Amino acid sequence: MSGLGTMVLTLLLLVFMVTSHQDGGKKQATQRNAVNIRRRKSITQRTTDEKCNEYCEERDRNCCGKANGEPRCARMCFG
């Protein structure tokens, strides 16, 4: 009986360890996805000032921010 009890306890411990390890992987993946979404938002949501907007509107383009202090104008802004 004691051998059987030891085997049952060992199996329960193994099952607990495996399921907790799998849950940790899901949590880690969720956190990684959240970080990726935050990075994407920060890339696409750039702040532009009025001078850049006016400068680019004269050229029928969108202001994509500034590079070396100069406005960057393009039809579509990418990162």
Curated annotation (Swiss-Prot):
Residues 21-46 form a propeptide. It is found in: Secreted. Residues 1-20 form the signal peptide. One of its GO terms (cellular component) is extracellular region. The modification Phenylalanine amide is found at residue 78. It comes from the Eukaryota. Pfam families: Conotoxin (PF02950). Expressed by the venom duct. Disulfide bonds join 52-64, 56-73, 63-77. One of its GO terms (molecular function) is ion channel inhibitor activity. Keywords: Amidation, Disulfide bond, Knottin, Neurotoxin, Secreted, Signal, Toxin. Belongs to the conotoxin O3 superfamily. The presence of a 'disulfide through disulfide knot' structurally defines this protein as a knottin. This is Conotoxin LiCr173. It comes from Conus lividus (Livid cone).
